[in-house]
Amino acid sequence: MYGLINIGFGNVISGDRVIAIVNPESAPLKRLKDEAKDEGKLIDATYGRKTRAILITDSNHIILSAIQPETIAQRFKQSMIEIEENLNKVR
């Protein structure tokens, strides 16, 4: 019910498919990123910039973003608010 979420540089994802937004600094997440690359499930949306957030989807795809996790989370929240406002207008 989140719709499309901007993850930076004109890239958008389906908010309903995201199950986690995490900071990429830990070793387990670096391994997860490497495994996804080997399996062909890594999507790099950083445009060569530093990875600041890793988004994990329900299909086990790993999406790299150059936007901070907090910023992406705020965009999810804003998207939900906009959807609720539109639903209230219809009711």
Swiss-Prot record:
Q: What InterPro entries has UniProt attached to this entry?
A: RemA-like
> Where in the sequence is the signal peptide annotated?
none
Instruction: Cite the Pfam families for this sequence.
Output: RemA-like
Which parts pass through the membrane?
Answer: none
- Family statement drawn from the similarity comment of this UniProt entry: Belongs to the RemA family.
Q: Which PANTHER family match?
A: REGULATORY PROTEIN SSL2874-RELATED (PTHR38449:SF1), REGULATORY PROTEIN TM_1690-RELATED (PTHR38449)
| Name under which the protein is recorded | Putative regulatory protein Tlet_1629
Species of the source: Pseudothermotoga lettingae (strain ATCC BAA-301 / DSM 14385 / NBRC 107922 / TMO) (Thermotoga lettingae)
